[in-house]
């Protein structure tokens, strides 16, 4: 396969014999594919350069102080930026004293406390004006108070009016049901704190997608949280639900770049095929007009998923980051 890139975009994809002339050529002995996208990171707790070298060319940050993360997201658009493209939610909307305001990992401003439906809607308006790519809401009843049903409804409505998805951190009995009832778009983690009923998972499969984040509960070990999350995810998928790749990078011992442990958990404990995992992993199809964000594992990952940890090439916005 030959891919021709120009000014950060893919210009042409096809066989070598039909390719248009290019100013520079690079031959790579590997499997050429789109770069990976991690839909749940805290990039302020990670090294963006290492994330990119590991094959993740786009990330979505799901909770960080707005005065830090939005300028960083803007900077990631520049050709000189050493890291992945960053899209950001900004701070997580929460109740006064709610998660993550007391967490050690979260600097001041990571949680945005709201009081009442009007304040909740205004928070969404402000974040949208600053360039938020999504709105994250905290429904962690195990760590503290959560937004009221009225506040949650106002958040979802205000986000919908601005074309923004709402992703929910659901933790604690009944929080998944609350999120679904309010009309959120996504669960930022697969629920791990309780085994969800078949009826809840069937409703979820029709309404939300789930960001995987399995390795954050295990780091290579088998835990009760991992067993609950994978059981919920397998049944969610059996009901027709969509899973996308995400790691919660920055929290715990998650490696920068593509987390092969996460990928293997999706296959071994959830039952996803290699093709399904790659579809969940990549930022988008390899096609003309798309971003020139490419990686080349040493082997075909459809046959050996561990090849995603052995990269021969990383290209970000048409710029060669590394080539072996």
What are these regions (language model features)?
Residues 228-301:
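His/Asp/Glu-enriched, well-ordered alpha-helical/loop segment
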Residues 138-231, 239, 244-251, 270-272:
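Active-site core of metal-dependent hydrolases
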Residues 48-140, 144-164, 207-217:
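Divalent-metal coordination cores built from histidine and acidic residues
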Residues 3, 8, 29, 37-40, ...:
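Divalent metal-coordination and catalytic microenvironments
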Residues 93, 117, 167-173, 298:
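Glycine-rich beta-to-alpha transition loops that act as phosphate-gripper elements at the mouths
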Residues 1-21, 299-304, 319-320:
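N-terminal metal-binding scaffold of metallo-dependent hydrolase/deaminase domains
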């Amino acid at each position: 396969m030959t891919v021709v890139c120009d000014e950060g975009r893919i210009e042409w994809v096809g066989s070598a014999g039909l390719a248009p002339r290019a100013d520079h050529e690079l031959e790579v002995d590997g499997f050429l594919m789109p770069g990976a996208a991690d839909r749940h990171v805290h990039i302020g707790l990670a090294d963006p350069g290492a994330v990119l070298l590991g094959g993740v060319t786009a990330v979505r940050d799901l909770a960080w102080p707005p005065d830090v993360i939005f300028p960083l997201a803007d900077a990631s658009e520049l050709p000189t930026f050493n890291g992945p493209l960053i899209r950001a939610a900004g701070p997580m909307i929460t109740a006064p004293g709610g998660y993550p305001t007391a967490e050690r990992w979260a600097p001041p401003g990571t949680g945005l406390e709201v009081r009442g439906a009007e304040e909740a809607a205004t928070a969404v308006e402000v974040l949208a004006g600053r360039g938020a790519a999504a709105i994250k809401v905290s429904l962690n009843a195990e760590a503290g108070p959560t937004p009221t049903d009225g506040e949650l409804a106002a958040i979802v409505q205000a986000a919908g009016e601005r074309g923004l998805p709402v992703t929910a951190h659901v933790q604690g009995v009944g929080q998944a049901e609350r999120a679904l009832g309010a009309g959120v778009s996504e669960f930022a983690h697969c629920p791990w704190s309780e085994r969800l009923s078949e009826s809840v998972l069937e409703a979820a499969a029709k309404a939300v997608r789930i960001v995987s984040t399995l390795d954050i509960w295990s780091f290579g070990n088998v835990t009760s949280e991992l067993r609950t999350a994978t059981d919920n995810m397998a049944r969610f998928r059996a009901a027709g639900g969509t899973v996308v790749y995400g790691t919660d990078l920055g929290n715990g011992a998650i490696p920068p770049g593509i987390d092969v442990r996460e990928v293997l958990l999706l296959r071994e404990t959830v039952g996803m095929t290699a093709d399904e995992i790659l579809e969940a992993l990549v930022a988008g199809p390899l096609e003309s007009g798309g971003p020139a964000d490419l990686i080349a594992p040493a082997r075909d990952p459809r046959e050996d998923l561990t090849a995603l940890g052995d990269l021969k090439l990383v290209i970000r916005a048409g710029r060669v980051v590394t080539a072996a």
